[in-house]
């Protein structure tokens, strides 16, 4: 079994929108010891999929929910500790402050991964400019 992972919005979008790199993310998820995501990722995934696939946000959320259940992904809450880590993340790596240019949801994904000592599974070039452990 692989490591504990926190799954970012970008990965859910890649999988649920059937992007070219979908399979590699599915393998990472399947081989993880434990899989986490957050309620903020739920919202952002529904928003991005609804726009990208021209569907209702509730339908996009339904696809997300089905995937969480199928892949045994645990949804965690954002508490005060995670929120404070997200503020620290923005101060260090946020848009207009650092080359990583992390946005609101990115900062929360970073904070969740750090709070749970999880590797962050993501797509793109932003998180690799931070100090978060990544898959």
Predicted segments with their positions:
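Anion (oxyanion) recognition and catalysis
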Residues: 29, 69, 114
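Active-site neighborhoods of divalent-metal-dependent phosphate/nucleic-acid chemistry enzymes
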Residues: 74-119
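Helix-loop "lid/cap" segments that line or gate small-molecule binding pockets
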Residues: 48-51, 72
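Alpha-helix capping/helix-boundary segments
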Residues: 11-12, 41-42, 82, 108-109, ...
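Short, well-structured N-terminal submotif of metal-dependent ribonuclease cores
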Residues: 1-41, 51-66
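General small-molecule cofactor/ligand-binding pocket signal
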Residues: 36, 76, 135
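Acidic, PIN/NYN-like endoribonuclease modules and their adjacent C-terminal/linker elements
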Residues: 2-4, 110-135
């Amino acid at each position: 079994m692989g490591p504990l992972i926190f799954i970012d919005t970008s990965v859910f979008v890649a999988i649920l929108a059937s992007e070219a790199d979908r399979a590699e993310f599915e393998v990472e998820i399947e081989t993880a010891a434990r899989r986490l995501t957050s309620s903020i990722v739920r919202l952002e995934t529904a928003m991005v999929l609804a726009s990208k696939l021209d569907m209702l946000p509730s339908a996009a959320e339904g696809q997300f929910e089905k995937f969480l259940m199928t892949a045994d992904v645990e949804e965690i809450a954002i508490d005060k500790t995670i929120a404070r880590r997200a503020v620290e993340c923005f101060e260090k790596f946020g848009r207009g402050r650092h080359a990583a240019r992390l946005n609101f949801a990115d900062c929360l994904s970073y904070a969740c991964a750090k709070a749970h000592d999880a590797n962050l599974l993501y797509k793109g070039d932003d998180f690799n400019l931070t100090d978060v452990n990544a898959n």
